[in-house]
Amino acid sequence: MPSPADPHTAGAPAACAPPVGAAPFVPAAAPFVPAAARVLERRQEAPDVVTLWLEPPAGGWTWRPGQFHMLTAFGVGEVAISISDLPGDGRAIRHTVRDVGAVTHALCASRPGTLVGVRGPYGTDWGLDAIPPAADVVVVAGGIGLAPLRGAVAALAAAQPSRPGRLFVAIGARLPDQVAFADEHDAWAALGATVRVTVDAAPAGYDGRVGLVTALLPELGFDPAGATALVCGPEVMMRFVGRQLVELGLHPDRIAVSLERNMQCGAGLCGHCQLGPLLLCRDGPVVAYPTAIALLREPER
């Protein structure tokens, strides 16, 4: 879940299992006490999007692509932010934040040296370990939805030289200056990934693709037999992308989507992030498409 959305209460049945091998991670001790982490680096990704690198704690960070942290802007509040990084030992970890409210505004304004609070990681992940090496992987991102997918893309791209399955990345954004991680696309392609980008609108003279991200999917050339798709973006986009992937031959069970609501506790206790039978901080954010499709008909709040 890329940036905050909004509210919702109660338990989720065991049948709501995480997709493609993902499993919830519950922090062992003091889950509601944030650790202080210093901002080491800040980069402006787009006019309203900032990536922050946070110093690692003793022993480094542990997480899986698709999970999220609860970040605290001290004196302002706390918000759920996806981890937009590839797991590694002892490195700073990056979070990509869109400026949409008081807490995210404070986080986006953070400069190197600022202390922020970190809780987690929480939630389900993209289940990369469960994807067969020979299967094609299709990643579809809309706008800031590429942030929760970036770690998965980086991991899959790094494995491309030795992985028989191919990697396809389709990215959509509203405007050219809102394309996330544009400076990394060539590196992913150099490792063997097929990367395509489209924008909804562009100024005169723009020589890139203009149109909906769904228009890219039939052109990618992936083998739907056994393929896995990872999808994150606005909910209306995910509805149409999921439908088109199924029409192109992907099995619905092999499509994973990342859903967001107003996550507050991160541990499935407060009920603010309830969506149907799911508590998205615990049973999500990554869920299987068949589970998500009925829930995606509910409007964003």
Regions of interest found by a model, annotated:
Residues P2-T9, A14-T114, A173-L175:
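Ferredoxin-reductase
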Residues G242-R243, L248, A256, G271-E300:
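Iron-sulfur (Fe-S) cluster-binding segments and ferredoxin-like electron-carrier domains
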